[in-house]
């Protein structure tokens, strides 16, 4: 719980800093922002490499994972689609309900609700002495597939934002090569896996993706550049590693510290939401979401509660499957999937790169904050249900 509360604290500190720093730094702010964004990408790459390291499947039994993958995909898709509909039909005026650009923007932004925080989840269940239970083993598979589905779907969403250009085929080609390499050589790379090496690999991945963008932007112009998000390349790097569990106090402190820095930087990346500067930015916005007028804080909070409820209702998909298990086990499995964290925050940051903003962005960030606040309640709920019906696995 201390880690969850720290996530919340650093995210909130970042949100406060995002409103104060532009005025405090003045003309130096753009340089500071560029440095902070670079650090954020490196932290996100570090997190995704570790998610990839956790992705361990027996390829000889790949058919047995099919049902789990489709359940995880549905568990990621339902909250996403519910929030897309909410953002379109509740937040936007009716004349934009059929606007294709509005749908594209909200399809990308709403994806923050899809991923489950695997790190928070596994730590939580292990601390409850449930590591040998069916719930733990099943949720481990679902949470990883959940994150994988989020990463993969970001590719067509990115293509949707770009439009039907030649870069789309280049991006698809890179994605196909990465997926084939990840599957073909999964867990084959026998490499040192301490936090320094993983952070270094993350920096290399970020440098390569940024270099590709800079070179193609110089050759073809920013509008025709190739921009590969760091999520999938970093995940595949983690997949290639022959997993080694390095559970030392130093490793735990380093990994936790990088996650805290990531949440702080995500908060700091938010645009101004109050004052004349925020109004001017909304008036000059190039996206539909960012051009929407800011709402009163009381109305925003009501939307945050509604979006949080929808995102968690959507995560109840596993209740309707695994009928050979008790209802309490299936409910515990679903509630465990309520936890959100770094990957969802990463999706919000990527959405910012496409100039998305406005009330929908603020609601998304505050929904993540509310979810972190409620994580303690989710822990207690899962504990009661799981210990009531815990079935150890052989």
What residue spans do the PLM features occupy?
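Structural signature of hydrophobic alpha-helical transmembrane segments
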Residues: 33-48, 101-117, 165-177, 223-236, ...
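Membrane-interface alpha-helices at helix entry/exit sites of multi-pass transporters
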Residues: 131-145, 152, 166-170, 249-250, ...
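Small-residue-rich segments of transmembrane alpha-helices in multi-pass membrane proteins
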Residues: 10-17, 70-84, 141-154, 197-213, ...
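Transmembrane alpha-helices that form the ion-translocation and gating core
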Residues: 61-130, 264, 269-388
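Core mid-bundle transmembrane helix pairs that form the ion/substrate translocation pathway
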Residues: 144, 148-151, 155-261, 393-394
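N-terminal membrane topogenic signal
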Residues: 1-9, 192-197
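Membrane-interface helix termini and inter-helical loops of multi-pass transporters
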Residues: 22-34, 91-100, 159-167, 215-226, ...
